[in-house]
């Protein structure tokens, strides 16, 4: 959900009102193809769905079903922002609402979404921010399993 929840601040629906919210993403104007970013361990299956609630309620939407392969390591935030940039570069109907940047509140991610820096730069930035958080949170963690890290 860390990345999927950001779709609510765009003109893409995260499948609210379907049997697979946050697994389906799309809009009536999306024409799915094989150019959408697809990290290792993920299948981006073309699909259509009709939400019974939320944005595009009752309208047929086309897009993708995000399927994780068994044992896949998945970084929802990074994949979501990568997909957002893809939609902004391929669909004039795609909009990032002002509330999106308020929720992101990170200048490096904002610059990536605006097309000003590469994915490698934002990926390293997020990795660094996660490591800083882990160091701060370490004294409060009650378990030994390491939180997910970007490899």
Task: Identify the meaning behind each predicted range.
Residues 1-22, 26:
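A surface/extracellular/periplasmic glyco- and lipid-processing/surface-interacting theme
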């Amino acid at each position: 959900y860390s990345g999927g929840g950001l779709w609510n601040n765009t003109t893409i629906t995260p499948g609210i009102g379907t049997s697979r919210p946050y697994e389906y993403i799309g809009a009536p104007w999306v024409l799915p193809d094989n150019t959408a970013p697809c990290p290792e361990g993920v299948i981006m299956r073309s699909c259509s769905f009709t939400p019974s609630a939320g944005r595009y309620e009752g309208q047929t939407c086309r897009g993708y079903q995000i399927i994780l392969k068994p044992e896949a390591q998945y970084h929802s935030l990074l994949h979501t922002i990568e997909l957002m940039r893809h939609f902004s570069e391929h669909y004039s109907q795609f909009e990032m609402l002002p509330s999106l940047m308020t929720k992101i509140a990170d200048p490096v991610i904002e610059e990536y979404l605006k097309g000003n820096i590469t994915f490698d730069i934002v990926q390293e930035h997020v990795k660094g921010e996660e490591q800083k958080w882990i160091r701060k949170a370490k004294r409060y963690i009650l378990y030994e399993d390491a939180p997910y890290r970007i490899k």
